[in-house]
C-alpha cells in the first residue's frame, strides 16, 4: 500500500512539475519569445528529469519493496496475493492515467497537426508576402515608369506652354509693331489729307487766278478794241482835220504842201499800227504764258490730288488689312490664352489626381506593411506555440519513457524475486513485450529529442533571422517611401514655381 501511495504521489508531483496549470504554462509559452521558448524548454527538461528521478525512485522503492527480505525464509502465499492485488490496483490506476495521458497526447498531436497545417498555410502566405515584397520592385518600376511618363507629359505641357508664351509674346510684339505702323500710317494719312487740303486750296486759288486772268484778258481785249476804235476815230478826225487843213492850205500852196502831208499821215498811221500790233502781240503772249502756267499748275495740282487720292486709298486698304490682321491676331491670342488656361487647369487636375493616387498607393503600402507585420507576428506566435507543444510532447515522451523504464525495472525486480504460484496474471505478456520494445527504443528517443532540440534551436534562429530581415525590409521600405515622398514634394514645388 505504501508503494501505491508513493507511486501516485510521485506521478502526480511529476505531472504538476512538468505541466503545472495548463493555462499558466500555455500563457508562459505563448507570451515568451525565442528566449522564453528556450527557458521553457530548459524548465521542461528539469521537470522531466525530476519526474524521471521520481519514477526511478518509485521503481526502486518497488524493487526494494519486492526485494525486502521476509521475516521467514519462505514467502507466504497470502502476502504474495495481497501484493499482487495491490500491484493490480496500481497497474489499473497507472493504466487509467496512461489512458488519460494518451488521450491528451492524441489531442495534442491532433492540435499539432492542425498547427502544422496552419503553419504551412502561414508559410505559404509568408512566401507570397515575401514574393509580393520582392515584387514591389516591379510595382515600383511600374510606378516609376508611370511617374516618368507623367513627368514627360508635364515637361511636354510645360514646353508647349513656354512655346505658347513665346508665340504670344511674339504676337504681342507684332501687334505692337503693327499698331505703331498703323499709327504712323494714320499720321501720314492725316499729313496727306492736310497736304491735299492745302493743294485743294492752291487749286482753288489757281482757278480763281485763272478766272481773274480770263476776266483781265477780256477787259484788255475790250480795252484794245476800244483803243482801236478810239484810234480809228482819232485817225479819222486827224484825217478830217488834215483834209480840212489841206484844203485850207491848198488854197495857199496846193502843189507844194500836198505830198508832204500825205507822207506824214502815212508815217503816223504806220507808227500807230505798229504800236497797236506790238501791244496786241505782247498782250496775247502774256495771256498765253499766264494761261500755260495756270494750266501747268492745274495739271500739277490734279496730278498731286490724284496721287494723294491713290495714296489715301492705298493707306485705307492697308489700314483695313492691318485691322483685319490685328483682329485675327487678337482672336489667335485669345484662343492661345484660353488654351493656356485649359492646359493649366488640366495640369493642376492631373497633378491633384496623381497626388491622390500617390496617397492611395502609400495608404495601400502602409496597409500591406501592417498586414505583413500582423502575419509575421501571428507566424511568430504560432512558431512559439509549436515550440511549446514540441516541448510538451517531449516532456510527455520523457514521462512515458520514464514510466516504461520504471515498468521494465519493476518487471525485472519482480522476476528476480522468488517464483510465485501463478505469475502470469501479474503482468500481461503484451505489456511486457511493449515495455521491452520501448526500453530498446529509449536510446533512439533520446537521439530524437536531441535532434528536435537542435531543430527547435534552428527554428528559433530562423524566426529571429526572419524577424530581423523583415525589420530590415520594413526599414528599407519606409526609407524608400520617404525618399519618394520627398522627391514628389520637390517635383510639385518645382512645377508650381515654374507655373
From Swiss-Prot:
Question: According to the UniProt record, where is the region Coil 1B?
Answer: 143-238
Kindly give the PROSITE patterns that the UniProt entry links to this protein.
IF_ROD_1, IF_ROD_2
Q: Name one GO cellular component term.
A: postsynaptic intermediate filament cytoskeleton
| PTM (free text) | O-glycosylated.
- For the region Coil 2, what residue ranges are annotated? 263-408
Q: Where is this region: Coil 1A?
A: 88-129
Region of interest (Head), ranges:
1-87
Entry-linked InterPro entries: IF_conserved, IF_rod_dom, Intermed_filament_DNA-bd, Intermediate_filament
- GO annotation (BP), single: postsynaptic modulation of chemical synaptic transmission
Annotated region Tail: the residues are 409-499
Q: Any stretches that span the bilayer, and where are they?
A: none
Residue numbers bearing the N6-acetyllysine modification: 290
Pfam families referenced in this protein's UniProt entry, alphabetically: Filament, Filament_head
Annotated GO molecular function terms are: structural constituent of cytoskeleton; structural constituent of postsynaptic intermediate filament cytoskeleton
**Phosphoserine (modified residue): where?**
72, 219, 335, 469, 496
Q: Which residues form the IF rod domain?
A: 94-407
Family per record: Belongs to the intermediate filament family.
| Quaternary assembly | Forms homodimers (in vitro). Forms heterodimers with NEFL, NEFM or NEFH (in vitro).
The role this protein plays is: Class-IV neuronal intermediate filament that is able to self-assemble. It is involved in the morphogenesis of neurons. It may form an independent structural network without the involvement of other neurofilaments or it may cooperate with NEFL to form the filamentous backbone to which NEFM and NEFH attach to form the cross-bridges. May also cooperate with the neuronal intermediate filament protein PRPH to form filamentous networks.
Q: Know the name of this protein?
A: Alpha-internexin
Q: What is the lineage of its organism?
A: Eukaryota, Metazoa, Chordata, Craniata, Vertebrata
